Amino acid sequence: MTWEVVIGLEIHAQLTTKTKIFSGSSIDYGAAPNTQANLLDLGMPGQLPVLNKAVIPKAIKLGLALGAKIGRRSVFDRKNYFYPDLPKGYQTSQFSFPIVDTGGVVEIEVDGEIKKIGVTRAHLEEDAGKSIHDAFPGQTGIDLNRAGTPLLEIVSEPDMRSAKEAVAYAKKMHELVQYLGICDGNMQEGSFRVDSNVSIHKPGTPFGTRAELKNINSFKFIEQAIELEIERQIEVLESGGKVVQETRLYDADKNETRSMREKEEANDYRYFPCPDLLPVVITEEDIEAIRAEMPEMPDAKRKRYVADFGLSDYDAAFLTGSRAMAEYFEAVVAKTNEAKVSANWVMGELSKSLNQKGIDISESPVSADMLAGLIERIQDNTISGKIAKQVFDGMWSGEGSADEIIEQKGLKQITDSSAIEALVNDVLANNAAQVEAYKGGQEKMFGFFVGQVMKASQGQANPAQVNQVLKDKLK
C-alpha cells in the first residue's frame, strides 16, 4: 500500500544574548544547577518580567532573511500548562501576534531537486527549565538555569515529504541562524533543538493524525527518528489500528521512539495576552535599520563565489558552510588575490588539520593572514608547493609565520639556473643507463630524473626550472 508522508518542523533556536528574555540572569552554559535562576525564573510571586530588548532585532533579522512579514504589533501571551520544570505554571510565548508572521520561504536541495519550504511563523518565547532523570534514581531533579532563556521558535509549513527533506530544511535553518549571528547553533548544548511533526495518509485523502518527536539534537537522529516514526505509523494503520495524537521521545541508544504524553491542541493551553508585558510596536524605520545591518546570506554568497571567483558549485558550498569559514576564506583572498589557490588551501590542508584536531575554523592556530603569507611565498617562488606543506605544518605547530619558518629552516627554493644545472648534470651522470633508456624511447624515465633532482635538492629546486633544464639536456 502506498503512503504519503507529511512532515512539519518546529525549531527552537536559543538567541545569543547575555541574559534571559525577561530577567537579568545569565544564560552561560554549564553553570552549577540552579545558580543562574533569580526569583522571576523560580516563579516567586510579585516578580514582574522586563523584556530584554536585544531579542527583538535578532528575531526581525530572521524574518527579513526568510522574506517573511514582520509583525508591526507583537504581543506576548501566557501559555498555561503544568510541568515540574515550569514553576510559574505558564510559559510566556507569542500566539496570535508573533514577531515574524507569514510568507517566509526556505529553499532546500535533495537528490538534485530544489524545493521550497514555507515558514508559517517565528515567535519569541522563554525556555523552560530542565528535568534531570539520571542523577537521582527513582526521582527527578529540576535545574532552572535554562528557565527564561530566550528562544525563537521557527514553525514550518507541513511541506516536507521525507526524512531527507526534513534534515535538509533543518540544516538550512541551522546555517541561516548562525550566519545571522542570532544563535550559535550548538546542538549538543541544546541551543538548536528540533521537534518533528509526522503523519501519513493515502494520496488523495486528508492528512493523517500527527505525532510529535520532541527535542532531537542531531541531524543524524532527526533522520533516524522520522524514519522510525513513519515505519511505526504504517505498521499501526496497516494492522487496523489508529495513530494517536501524541508526543514521542526518540531513544538514540535503543533506536526507537516511545510515547511521552498525549499531544495538546492550542486551546488546551488557554492562551491569553500577558498582562505584565506591553505589546512591542515595530516601525518601518526599525526594520530598515536592521536590514542595513544584515550580512550577506549563504545562498547569495555561494552564487557570488561561482560568478566572481570562478569556483565550482561544490567548492562554493564548502567554503560557505559556515560564516566563520567564509570570512576566513575571503580574508585570505583579499590578501593574495588568488581565489582558487586560496580555496584549495582552505579546503585541503587547513580543513584536514581542523578535522584531525576536532576544532572549528575560529579556533585555528593558523590565521587567515598566516595562510595568505604562505600562499604569497608560493606565488613569488620563494618556496615550492611541496615545501609549502612542510611550512604549513610548522605554522600549525606554532613555530611562527611562513617567513620565519622558511628562514629558520633554510627552505627557500633554489632558482639559480647554474645551481639547478649542476644538480641535473650530477643526476644524469650517475644514471647513465636510465639516460640511454630514455633516449631509446622510454619517456616515462623523465619523471625518474625529475624525482632524483628534487631528492638531491631536498625538494627545494624550482620544479619548472628542473623540467626545462632536463628537457634541454636530454634532447
Swiss-Prot record:
EC no.? 6.3.5.-
The processes (GO biological process) annotated in the record are:
glutaminyl-tRNAGln biosynthesis via transamidation; translation
Superkingdom classification of source = Bacteria
| EC category | ligase
Pfam families found in the cross-reference section = GatB_N (PF02934), GatB_Yqey (PF02637)
Keywords attached to this Swiss-Prot or TrEMBL record, sorted alphabetically, are: ATP-binding, Ligase, Nucleotide-binding, Protein biosynthesis
Function field: Allows the formation of correctly charged Asn-tRNA(Asn) or Gln-tRNA(Gln) through the transamidation of misacylated Asp-tRNA(Asn) or Glu-tRNA(Gln) in organisms which lack either or both of asparaginyl-tRNA or glutaminyl-tRNA synthetases. The reaction takes place in the presence of glutamine and ATP through an activated phospho-Asp-tRNA(Asn) or phospho-Glu-tRNA(Gln).
Family annotation (PANTHER family): GLUTAMYL-TRNA GLN AMIDOTRANSFERASE SUBUNIT B MITOCHONDRIAL AND PROKARYOTIC PET112-RELATED, GLUTAMYL-TRNA(GLN) AMIDOTRANSFERASE SUBUNIT B, MITOCHONDRIAL
The subunit field of the Swiss-Prot or TrEMBL record says: Heterotrimer of A, B and C subunits.
The family database entries (NCBIfam families) matched by this protein are listed as: gatB (TIGR00133), PRK05477.1-2 (NF004012), PRK05477.1-4 (NF004014), PRK05477.1-5 (NF004015)
What protein does this entry describe?
Aspartyl/glutamyl-tRNA(Asn/Gln) amidotransferase subunit B
